[in-house]
């Protein structure tokens, strides 16, 4: 990709991100689960927007998981366990401007399958 195409791709993602964040708000009972995917790894965190603090997080890089759908499902299982330890059963899913496809969708489905209501 040339520089102009990369700039446009990032600008479109930033616009989607702002549009989504204006509608989502997490609190202590129903935190916002924000995901980030790089070219190699996948990260997620549960955020209480009222207190502006992170409740729990998961880092695929430290656990040796790559940015694949299979690894996203495994991370979803582990993250669901972390959320249940914190006493959280319902969350607001913030896809962070990414399209709901591939690893972003696989992670969300894995959370649902493990008892977290999105």
Swiss-Prot record:
This entry carries the following GO cellular component terms, namely: cytosolic large ribosomal subunit
Query: What keywords appear on the UniProt entry?
Result: Ribonucleoprotein, Ribosomal protein, RNA-binding, rRNA-binding
- Matching CDD domains: Ribosomal_L18_L5e
What is the top-level taxon of the source organism?
Bacteria
Gene3D superfamilies (UniProt xref): 3.30.420.100
- What's an example GO BP annotation here? translation
Relate the protein's function as given in its record.
Answer: This is one of the proteins that bind and probably mediate the attachment of the 5S RNA into the large ribosomal subunit, where it forms part of the central protuberance.
Q: What is the annotated quaternary arrangement, including any partners?
A: Part of the 50S ribosomal subunit; part of the 5S rRNA/L5/L18/L25 subcomplex. Contacts the 5S and 23S rRNAs.
The family database entries (PANTHER family) matched by this protein are listed as:
39S RIBOSOMAL PROTEIN L18, MITOCHONDRIAL, LARGE RIBOSOMAL SUBUNIT PROTEIN UL18M
The entry sums up its family as follows: Belongs to the universal ribosomal protein uL18 family.
Official protein name in the record: Large ribosomal subunit protein uL18
Top-down, what is the taxonomic lineage of the species of origin?
A: Bacteria, Pseudomonadati, Campylobacterota, Epsilonproteobacteria, Campylobacterales
Gene name in the database record: rplR
């Amino acid at each position: 990709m040339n520089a102009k195409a990369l700039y446009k791709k990032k600008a479109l993602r930033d616009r989607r991100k702002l549009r989504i964040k204006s509608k989502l708000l997490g609190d202590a009972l129903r935190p916002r689960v924000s995901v980030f995917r790089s070219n190699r790894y996948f990260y997620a965190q549960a955020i209480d927007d009222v207190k502006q603090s992170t409740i729990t997080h998961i880092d695929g890089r430290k656990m040796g998981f790559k940015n694949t759908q299979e690894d996203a499902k495994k991370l979803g299982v582990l993250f669901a366990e972390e959320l249940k330890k914190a006493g959280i059963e319902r969350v607001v899913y913030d896809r962070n401007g990414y399209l709901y496809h591939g690893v972003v969708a696989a992670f969300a489905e894995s959370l649902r399958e493990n008892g977290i209501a999105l």
